[in-house]
């Protein structure tokens, strides 16, 4: 199906490319005219273009002249002239496409064209990069063009405070990473004051390395979270010790391909003996299963220096795709704690989600979206289906002459590594620069050790050397350079033969104390001379390296994605330079072992000798077949994630829209009055027990329950007399009107006490407090629902349809709860005892959970595990030697006789096959988030009546759920 879509998408490429060529011709036709303009005349172009837009001209109409202007300014500031293919790429981006341009074709410079053009509308343009360094570097370097033309340039980086971030967003053009843009969106939707908002909309975004951000990280939700209640760190440490006593394949199964584990009967017996319990699968021991599965996963599936590194007593996740450390991020659902326990470092507290959105849904909010990458065509169908983005391959400025050799396959990793070192030694001896791409930190360090033994000088670039990334890559093309890099580390900085001229010139000026931001005039004055000086130094070496064959890229193993292999290869052969690439494989590599067992069997059958490789197109083809299978699987996972997140996205859009309206001062007084009426009517309907006759209603229960929300002064006997002769809807309406009239009178008295302005402000604050709390509870309950919804398929029901249906019901229940709690809070503030509105607000906010201390995070990675950026905080250490049996006894004593011995995870079904138990989502005792988990029902209770269990919820939102 995907292949058919790909073919259909390519059918229109010729027509699109013709349009792009026409744009380049139109720009070239203006070059002489624009080149003749003085600096002042060029600067006057910006106000002229803005006036033309105001007068009704479209961006398409002014595009040729605007592009020609940017090209001329680039020549004068950077010494770089846009090639025709770069003009074509700029037009493709302006029209909302992905421009596929090979490495070294100057994508960063291409982005200046549509960025300037779209910034003329005054609505802001976001340029999205993969890390803070690139955002800062590009905003400085390319910012010279924009600043020359009178545009403001901002840059969002991690450490900035809200006032500074707001200033950066208010600039005409803002650079930043995908995470920073996404988190600021979430923070804006948690703000309590309009003045705290930082973003100003989502008009146009250009995403650099778009495949990395919109494909590789698409399954990663951005999450803002805070610490959950309770300290269960002892359990993680106990289970970390316990699993060391268990044996793989004897006590538990591991499926490395699917990244799941399963406990076997002998293992269950050992666990029960160790913990001193009779049955691991009793409801009281539900949470133990989660600790056990996470401990096994931490032991078998998450490897140090591959999936994570340990630095200064902290477990830091390594991005599988880039090899970069992800500072502050944490795996969710207790997995990170299990890894911390395994490594013997401090086990930090679990977190509770406050706000979340996937990158897919965040970027789909933009009015116009575009992207750049060197490798998008393999994912063209997904880009179109998910983001409505077409992929336009832009031809290279000069023909590609890189030689891509067939793969070499060896029996073992040891043989493969020996061959790699031999090949590198040969290349290094003649001075040819070599880039070795590895799949993990561990692999890079193994290769580095072998190169040290062979006395081959080299640089290592992996997650542990993140800070020097750009500097290492900038000189990786120099004569004799040998660079070992994990996957795509260093992506975003060109490897130029002889050295990266622009980077070296910028570094030299900064070392002398000149910066394009701090000392722009001096920097601009010295730039041409410094650039020419570096060019002269690099020129001879560039030619020498070309004669040696250019950059040799050596892949130490294949990645699951063809795209990432192509990105590694793409580091060589830029701008028509010579180059060569080859991948070395072994039958022990993960891709071969897990996804291509048939090819492995065929190779083994040939009886390979030690150290003897197989080099054949059939091997390369077999590897690509395995990669296609993995890519297809990952695409289906991303599609599935998006389908489920679309349910939440619709709800989130409505909630955030309403919240923004309240935050920005919309008068909600009429809404409050409607909340009062709706709440009263809901309670009346809950008390009538389905009877139309008022004499059959539970009047005592009605007024008792109603007084917990609105302390009504209406006399029960008087009401019964008035409605005695009425039935059905008329009776309900009459009772409602009497109680609502009394409530409004009380509310009016409240307004007289604190004034109209004071009450409006109080209403706004109360609604925000309640909405935030209920939305967090809703996220919590939707997570529960999603965790167990897959099991509905066993009952011949579509899990997605079930999730949509129940999610909608839960959303409606949340809306009712927001109305009810808002009314309850407003009527239970003792206004007479509160001197000012601020004090009243403080009283309200004390009733809601505080979200001042938050953690920022990113969720399920490619393995389906969630990652979370946790806030810093002190975690009280438990005694490492605490015995597990004693811990269970203590927990039982604390919870009371006959109650669960552990904080039970809640009503979500447990998938033993996947080992997924959301233990981090334990209900808070005072909130009783899942009181209906005991399975009880109370027949005869009205669905809107208070639940007899005493939780304070309506029956339908509590134990009434057990009747479904």
Curated annotation (Swiss-Prot):
GO cellular component, one term: cytosol
Protein topology in the membrane: Peripheral membrane protein
Oligomeric and partner information: Monomer and homodimer. Part of the essential Sec protein translocation apparatus which comprises SecA, SecYEG and auxiliary proteins SecDF. Other proteins may also be involved.
Xref: Gene3D superfamilies: 3.10.450.50, Helical scaffold and wing domains of SecA, P-loop containing nucleotide triphosphate hydrolases, SecA, preprotein cross-linking domain
GO terms, molecular function: ATP binding; metal ion binding; protein-exporting ATPase activity
Binding site residues for ATP: 86, 104-108, 494
Protein name from the UniProt record: Protein translocase subunit SecA
Function: Part of the Sec protein translocase complex. Interacts with the SecYEG preprotein conducting channel. Has a central role in coupling the hydrolysis of ATP to the transfer of proteins into and across the cell membrane, serving as an ATP-driven molecular motor driving the stepwise translocation of polypeptide chains across the membrane.
Cofactor: Zn(2+)
Composition bias type Acidic residues, residue spans: 871-882
Binding residues for Zn(2+): 947, 949, 958-959
Protein species of origin: Bifidobacterium longum (strain DJO10A)
